[in-house]
A protein has these predicted regions:
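C-terminal closing repeat unit and adjoining cap/tail of repeat-based domains
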Residues: 253, 339-344, 361-415, 420-423, ...
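Conserved blade-register residue in beta-propeller folds
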Residues: 97-99, 152, 200, 248, ...
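Sec-dependent N-terminal signal peptides of Gram-negative exported proteins
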Residues: 2-23
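Loop/turn-rich, solvent-exposed surfaces of beta-rich toroidal or solenoidal domains
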Residues: 288, 309-378
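Extracytoplasmic beta-rich repeat domains
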Residues: 67-78, 94, 110-135, 163-185, ...
Length: 427
């Protein structure tokens, strides 16, 4: 591993943990607004709780602040305090983490290690570069490398604090498509779907706390999804989607509380599940969408299918707004599903191959894989495209990020940062 420090500057915002009972609610709210520290934002739900968005999206409303060129990556950018973190695969050999100045894009440090790998030939068109979105927690950043390696680096200077090689430690096969899961940090622990299992590590030392949901890994079983934390049936739990099943797991002990097989095509259960009340929504490639109700009675959990419909999700995780999920489908269309009934209230026309989604109020910001940013109305009655603008000449598979009034676009080889304003409000 190589670590190159370019400067030492800035004081880091310490992210309040969602589970803390003593956190200052005012400070915590400010930190939630001012950061995008992990996969799909502060609460891993794809919802932006910061400044209200403008009513339209036009070239005049997006001001390019800076852009930087890198090697290819599918990792979403993460933003904490005055720093931005992004990854790249370099020279088909190294994986690199960059820390950038949020105002200028100037590099502060970079850390690299040998670790790239080739995905199977039939998926080569999808690229063999780093995929997982890092997670920042206080003065540490957790980064997953393709060869089933989890790195813990110091955010100040990129120094490696610990490294966990799941293949070496567990004797499991390499995940055929690389380490895809994005780390989840909560309390004293970091959780990942890696090493042909769900693993809880001590976030300070990298020591294994527990391991569960073991599978065969490799081509057939290595996870594509990322875990979230939710309270379901009165019990706080990890919600974990593997290639074959959906499970609830006790975050402290690793006990599997419940599991539900999710019908799938070749294990293509990819998106991050969505929690609604005591139910869980998921959707599977070339299959269907489901809502499962999780019950908890006399210390026993039960799972019941509430409904299913023919909406076929793929890689895009939906956003939940007012009892409806807005989902981008395998067939490259948007759809809206009423969670109470399972009814698909509308389906749009065609767009790109993939869209990442962020919601706020009655609006959805969607980054189309063709480099087009879309502003949609979260209208359950009809599809409503408010406006759109071209933001990249490259493909944009990495997840969109929004922090304050800034929009972060990670193209295949470029990171762009825009300030999104209302031109009518300018003096």
């Amino acid at each position: 591993m190589f670590c190159r420090i370019l400067s030492h500057c800035a004081t880091f915002l310490v992210i309040a943990r969602m589970a803390s009972a003593v956190a200052d609610p005012v400070v915590q709210a400010q930190e939630l607004r001012d950061s995008w520290p992990q996969w799909r934002g502060p609460q891993r739900d794809g919802i932006h709780r910061g400044k209200s968005w403008p009513e339209s999206l036009t070239p005049d409303s997006l001001n390019l602040l800076w852009q930087v060129t890198f090697g290819p990556s599918y990792s979403g950018p993460v933003i904490v305090g005055d720093r931005v973190f992004t990854t790249e695969t370099k020279d088909k050999k190294y994986e690199v983490v960059h820390a950038l100045d949020r105002k200028t894009g100037q590099e502060i440090w970079q850390t690299s290690w040998e670790g790239s790998m080739n995905v199977p030939f039939f998926a080569a068109a999808n690229g063999s570069w780093i995929r997982s979105t890092p997670a920042v927690d206080g003065d540490r950043i957790y980064v997953a490398g393709m060869r089933d390696v989890l790195m813990c680096l110091r955010t100040e200077d990129g120094k490696q604090l610990w490294r966990f090689d799941f293949v070496k430690e567990f004797g499991t096969p390499l995940p055929a498509f690389g380490f895809v899961c994005s780390p989840l940090v909560d309390g004293d622990y970091v959780y990942v779907q890696a090493g042909a299992s769900l693993v809880c590590l001590n976030k300070m030392t990298g020591a294994v706390v527990w391991r569960t949901l073991k599978d065969n890994g490799g081509m057939e079983d290595s996870a594509f999804s990322s875990p979230i934390l939710a309270t379901i049936g009165g019990k706080r739990q990890l919600l974990v989607q593997g290639r074959q099943k959906l499970s609830g797991v006790d975050p402290m002990t690793g006990e599997v509380l419940w599991s539900q097989f999710v019908p799938n095509y070749r294990g293509m259960n990819i998106l991050t599940p969505v929690v609604w009340n005591d139910s869980v929504f998921t959707s599977s490639y070339q299959n269907k969408s489901w809502l499962y109700r999780i019950s908890h009675d006399n210390q026993q959990f039960g799972v019941a299918e509430v409904w299913r419909n023919n909406a076929q999700g793929y890689m895009s995780t939906p956003v939940l707004i007012d009892d409806h999920v807005y989902l981008f489908l395998q067939n490259q269309r948007f759809t809206c599903i009423d969670l109470k009934t399972g009814e698909r209230t509308w389906t749009s026309g065609n767009f790109g191959k993939y869209c990442s989604l962020i919601g706020q109020g009655d609006k959805i910001l969607a980054l189309d894989q063709r480099g087009i940013l879309l502003l949609l109305r979260a209208n359950p009655k009809q599809f409503e495209l408010i406006s759109s603008v071209k933001v990249s000449d490259e493909e944009t598979w990495a997840h969109l990020a929004v922090c304050d009034d800034e929009v972060y676009i990670r193209g295949l080889n470029t990171l762009k940062v825009f300030r999104w304003t209302d031109p009518k409000a300018q003096p």
